[in-house]
Amino acid sequence: LSNMANASVKEFGKAWWSEVYNRIIGAAVFLDDASAECLHWDGGIFNLLNGGAVTVKTLSPFEVRSKVYKKAVFITQTTSTQLRTIHEIIQNSDFTHCILISCVSLDTVYLELNEGKDVSDVIASGRAQSEATKHLEGLLTEWIGKKQSAVEVVHIPIFTISPTSVVFLTPPYQNMYPTYNGKLIPDTSSLDLYTLTNDERSQVRRLASCLNSMLDSMNLKEDIFYMGAYSSLVAGVLENSPVCISRRKTCSNPASLIIVDRTLDLCAVTSHSMESVLDKVMAVLPRFPGHSNEVAVDMSPLCEANVIAHPEDIQLSPGCLFHANDESCMQTYDHMINKSQKEVMFDLYNKVSKIDVQKSPGARALLKVTPQSVEKIITATKGNYETIGRHLGMVQQALGVVQTLKAPRRAQLDLLTSLEAQVVQSLAASRDSTSVLHQISQLIKSRKDRNLPLENLLALIVHVYSLTGTEVSFSKKHEDNLSETLSVAIFEDHKTLFDEDPGRIVTPEACEEVAKGVMSRLKEVAQMRKILQNYQSVLKACEGGAGHEYRGVLQQLAEELVDARRPALPDLRRRHDPVKDLLRTGISMLTSKKPRASKHPLDNATVIIYVVGGITAEECKRLHRSVITSGVDNTVLIGSTRFVTPGEAMRDVLAL
């Protein structure tokens, strides 16, 4: 298991889940939300129940206790809060055998258990893992409180999901974002882990430790590159922690790991112009409860249940898009990322035609497949549970796409897409004399007439500030006017904009402060690419000469990365040990040989690009396409914290 050479991230996940399944026979299994989400992408709850678990529960102090279970398996991130929850569950149960599966490496857990103490000796000598194991096993034994008991603490790196063979996401880090004590730009130029809050520092260490486990399992010895201040911190932990250093001595397959801050370019994630069907579905349908990358499909059109409040209604479980045990569904899911809407609709129509009780015309006979033509076939199976059961995954996917394309929200997104296109051309044409902010202020004032949610207009404003960067200066008058307009709008829409306590009083003055905070964050967003050399501009003239288009930082990086001429990549930084660099320079002067050319990421067969702060399906498609069309032989994997929608990306960056 420690040497899955040349393996994909998907195989990495599967191999470690099988280690979990080996331990669950006869057990009550308790999972935290992130592990439950990872389980869904490996096949779901039946993997546990069919594998011998007697019950599966949420890791919660409110979970109903039962004295009948004697063995418990806890699958967790091993945070201090989760350890308290485990303590409560054990105290209220009658377990004699407890297994704690930590999804995070135990040396990282050891650092957190000893926050504020000097444990450098233990870390340097490599004893952190065994010390943490001993400590946690002692706690479990104490909590069980019986003479005859068995405990085990084991690290199993469950943290990835694989929507496709080249894309992976990391649910435990879904809320991780490049901020420093909550700010987008750090207060100091000498940045280190201690510039961060305790929680932020813990997240950086945890992510680095998980990436280390993945590289270890895939037998990869990496060169680390980064773009952005936050990514430099993750790179620093990976470069310098003793566990990572010793792993690089034993792993043999060379790889390049490129870590990128999302905040350098927020245009793609705040854009409403979506070609990928998956992005459209994610933007329209509600999230599956407890999940960051899955949607809830309303299944009531096929059932007799009278659903009132989808997806929370307890009468009927929501459907979803990803079905790990159905090859045909996984192919459709891949199409939803990588193919056009027309191709996805034909694919779905061909598949649902096989269950058609009314014998509709074949897809070839149709000039166009509409949501209505797919819906007609599916709803004809209402109440026919045997047929629905045989094609359950495909029916959920088809319903999800149909509900998205027929939703009133689609019309909102189309309007926002056209507004966005106008904004881009207006910015490109007028530059500093632009009246874009004035136009957006007018849009906010008339949003109710146009049926435009404030959340999406805020995403449009973030899009504008990230797109212009430092290339355009907005007039103070327009910015003040926008701040005033936002203040009124936030007060009017605060109930829909914030998930707030219904008893909380919101005043116009408080909303004015929120609006000022939004404006100062937007000005920081515009400064983000100042640190870059080649990728400061993302607004490029179209090749045909007509108008301008957005070409993102990730896209520009990918194109230069696979360019056969190997152009210099000054924006891809590497962390070097200055002492070693001095020694190398001294030795090369003595031996009079030319100094070595700097390393290029494609010198290594495997390249992993990881974006901290979210990515869209469309970006994954474009990055993958750049690699495929270039003809390079390298395996390029694309990872991120989660899939994001414009509304989520806006909330992340504005801290709303």
Where are the regions that the model predicts?
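Extended, well-folded catalytic/binding cores that form a central cleft or groove in large enzyme
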Residues: 2-656
